[in-house]
Amino acid sequence: MNLIRNEFMKTNQVIKSLIFVLACVIAARFLLPANWTPILALALFMPYVTSNKSIQVLMPISILLLTDIFLGFYGQTMFFVYATLILIAFISRHQSIGSLLSLMKHSVGSILIWHIVVNFGVYLNGHDGSSLAQTYLLAIPFDLRLMGSTAFFSLIFYSAWATKEHFRSSIEKA
């Protein structure tokens, strides 16, 4: 009986994950403005969701890949985008789980990493003669929107997680 229950729970978790991936792809493609995406917040939040380190990296990467399939691919800069997302997913493992302050610090830090690495890739692949400083400067408005969305979605994910944890502890006490 426990084997059946465990298999059902695993299947249920996979279905929930697929629905979440689909919802993020649809939101990023059809509902949200440019540079307003849950992808970085998800990469930061995955350690709250699962201890499986592969899933922590593969979930945000799969959402980004599916979104890129719909939106279109964008050349060699993609390497920097995907590498940065993987780096952020690895760094997120070192935050204090359960701490909103830690999550927000990692949100800001991830945007700084994103700004430095991805825009360096834009500079390397650019053909308009812009300087590196100019590339970083021109990216600030886009990255500020990305910071706003990362903080916003991190708060939403954290609120949902904290609510679930509150109800779980209430049920366990009863």
Predicted stretch roles:
Residues N2-Y48:
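Hydrophobic transmembrane alpha-helices
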Residues I15-F20, S54-L58, F79-A83, M104-V108, ...:
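Hydrophobic alpha-helical transmembrane segments
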Residues V21-L22, Q56-T67, L103-L112, A174:
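Central hydrophobic cores of alpha-helical transmembrane segments
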Residues I26-T37, I61-H94:
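Interfacial aromatic-anchored transmembrane helix boundaries in multi-pass membrane proteins
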Residues A27, M46-S54, F90-S99, S159-R168:
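Structural signal for the C-terminal ends of transmembrane alpha-helices
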Residues A43, G75-F80, A133-F142:
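Non-cytosolic membrane-interface motifs at loop->transmembrane helix junctions
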Residues P47-N52, F73, G109-V117:
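Small-residue-rich segments of transmembrane alpha-helices in multi-pass membrane proteins
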Residues S99-A174:
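Membrane-embedded alpha-helical hairpins and interfacial helices in multi-pass inner-membrane proteins
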